[in-house]
Amino acid sequence: MNLHEYQAKALLRAAGIKTPRGIIIKNSVEAKEAAQQLGGNRWVVKAQIHSGGRGKAGGIKTAQTLDEVHHISAAMLGSRLKTEQSSADGLPINEVLIEEECRAIATYYLALTLDRPRQQIVFIASMAGGTEIETVAETNPEAIIYAGVNPAIGFSPYLSARVGGALQLDKSYQLPLTKLMNRLYQLFIDNDLTLLELNPLIITEDHEFLPLDAKISIDDNALFRHQELVDLRDTTQEDHRETQAQELQLNYVPLDGTIGCIANGAGLAMATMDIIKLYGGEPANFLDVGGDATSERVKQAFKLILTSSRIKSILVNIFGGIVRCDLIADGIIQAAKEIDLKIPVIVRLQGNNVDLGRKMLDECPLNLQAADDLIDAAQKAIAAAQ
């Protein structure tokens, strides 16, 4: 689950980390009042969406008058912002953050994330602050510093010494950096985060560390113990199909292809996508109905996939271990009848009650085809999508 910038900064402040003063608004009428309340003569108007690259896309603008604050806010609110990291349709701007402008004497990148290959939490830092870290990793990878946290020890000052040295910080900043990194680490652990990114992290004219932007992602599997964070969820920023899939307990990720995929088990779902790619097709989604799939869940999976207008065929790949193939076949048939399915569905069944399941599909008058094996299924699905 992702948070908006203003929500992430609220968590930072609660952890004792200073952030720029700002006020969130939901309509442009509030814009001037917010700027007046902040004071000063320059403000930053920031669209709140769950995507990086807002600045390049025009989602972060500086205003020098109260009228400018109002006009920029009015133009943003209610519109959609498309960035390099968002979908083609962009994301709706329902809220705008008005912040005081802060001047920097130095700019950095600092983040905490999970390093799965190393099986540890890792600090990532760079002197190339304010730019997308993915771009830095591609063009200048030696500019990125990694400092892994030993899970048996937790945060230790040597980590900040290593990061401070790599960032060529003056020794006077070492203690503030240690305090900052320690608080970030505790925030990361206490809230089961998967990403905590400060970009840019600046040193102000008052010689203080200050995050101008903050991004936080929370482990969905840990949300059951963080109801206060669940309440911050903004479903308008999420693909409605993914939200619906979560409610149905389906693991779903939309893609750009034309062949819908349904499988039971994440590994089998990935193998199904791989075999489609291998034979020249393009999967339209990842969809795992789970090892204990029921006919009802399969029916809901069909409905979910068909919300995409790009789908030209569907490949169902089921291994009947715990689940019976005849129950899956029944779910497919019921879904096809209820939805009035017009596109070809290729079904590969293997395992428990497979013969009965295939028999049910063969006897069904609808546009359902049983496949002998996964290769046969992939080739039929690709041919049907042509």
Swiss-Prot record:
Record-listed Mg(2+) binding positions: 199, 213
Oligomeric form and interacting partners: Heterotetramer of two alpha and two beta subunits.
Similarity section: Belongs to the succinate/malate CoA ligase beta subunit family.
E.C. no: 6.2.1.5
Gene3D superfamilies per UniProt: ATP-grasp fold, A domain, ATP-grasp fold, B domain, Succinyl-CoA synthetase domains
Tagged with keyword Nucleotide-binding: yes
Name of the featured protein: Succinate--CoA ligase [ADP-forming] subunit beta
Single GO cellular component term: succinate-CoA ligase complex
Entry cofactors: Mg(2+)
Sequence ranges assigned to domain ATP-grasp in this UniProt record: 9-244
Its biological purpose: Succinyl-CoA synthetase functions in the citric acid cycle (TCA), coupling the hydrolysis of succinyl-CoA to the synthesis of either ATP or GTP and thus represents the only step of substrate-level phosphorylation in the TCA. The beta subunit provides nucleotide specificity of the enzyme and binds the substrate succinate, while the binding sites for coenzyme A and phosphate are found in the alpha subunit.
GO molecular function: ATP binding; magnesium ion binding; succinate-CoA ligase (ADP-forming) activity; succinate-CoA ligase (GDP-forming) activity
Pfam families: ATP-grasp_2, Ligase_CoA
Involved pathway(s): Carbohydrate metabolism; tricarboxylic acid cycle; succinate from succinyl-CoA (ligase route): step 1/1
InterPro entries in UniProt: ATP-grasp, ATP-grasp_succ-CoA_synth-type, ATP_grasp_subdomain_1, Succ-CoA_synthase_bsu_CS, SUCC_ACL_C, Succ_CoA_ligase-like_bsu, Succinyl-CoA_synth-like
HAMAP family xrefs: Succ_CoA_beta
